C-alpha cells in the first residue's frame, strides 16, 4: 500500500523475514513470523493491509518469510502448508495463477498479473523444504503458462518494477 496507512503490512513483513535473519535480527524475524501465522485466514491466504481481500502476491511473499524462518521456528509448518495449498488452489487448469481480487491493482499498466511469476519461488523452496514435489510441479506449470503466453511482455523490462526478472 503506501505511507498513508498506519497499519502493519503483512506482505512486506513476510519478505522482511529473510533480510532480518541475514542481518542477525532473529528475534524480530521470529516475532514477525508468529504475527503472520496468527493473521492467516482459515482458507490459507493472507489478506491486504485492511484485511478485506486475499491476494496471491501477498500470500506468496509471506510464504517466502515462512520458508526462511522454518529451520528456526518449525511451528510455522502448518501455516506454510496451508498457504502453499491455497496458492495451488488459485492455479487454473491451463496454469494461470489468478488472484481472487484485483481491487488494489489498478490497470495493467500499474500492476500486471505477471508479478505472479515472483510467487513461484516460495512454492519451489517449500517443495524442497517440506518434501512436497507437487508444489514445485505446480510452480513449473505456472511458469510454463506465462512463458508460453506472455514471453514478449515478460521480456519488456519497463513493466512493474522488474519483479518478473527477479522471478525468472
Regions found by a protein language model. Name each.
Residues 1-168:
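Glycan-recognition and catalytic cores of secretory/periplasmic carbohydrate-active enzymes
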Amino acid at each position: 500500500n503506501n505511507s498513508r496507512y498506519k497499519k502493519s503490512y503483512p506482505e512486506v513483513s513476510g519478505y522482511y523475514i529473510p533480510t532480518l535473519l541475514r542481518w542477525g535480527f532473529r528475534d524480530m524475524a521470529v516475532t514477525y513470523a508468529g504475527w503472520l501465522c496468527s493473521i492467516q485466514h482459515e482458507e490459507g491466504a493472507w489478506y491486504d493491509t485492511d484485511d478485506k481481500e486475499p491476494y496471491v502476491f501477498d500470500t506468496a511473499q509471506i510464504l517466502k518469510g515462512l520458508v526462511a524462518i522454518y529451520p528456526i521456528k518449525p511451528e510455522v509448518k502448518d501455516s506454510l502448508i496451508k498457504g502453499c495449498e491455497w496458492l495451488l488452489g488459485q492455479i487454473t487448469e491451463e496454469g494461470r495463477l489468478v488472484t481472487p481480487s484485483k481491487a488494489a491493482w489498478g490497470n495493467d499498466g500499474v500492476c500486471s498479473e505477471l508479478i505472479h511469476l515472483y510467487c513461484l519461488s516460495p512454492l519451489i523452496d517449500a517443495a524442497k523444504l517440506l518434501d512436497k514435489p507437487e508444489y514445485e510441479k505446480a510452480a513449473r506449470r505456472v511458469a510454463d503458462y506465462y512463458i508460453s503466453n506472455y514471453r514478449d511482455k515478460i521480456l519488456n523490462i519497463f513493466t512493474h518494477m522488474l519483479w518478473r526478472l527477479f522471478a525468472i
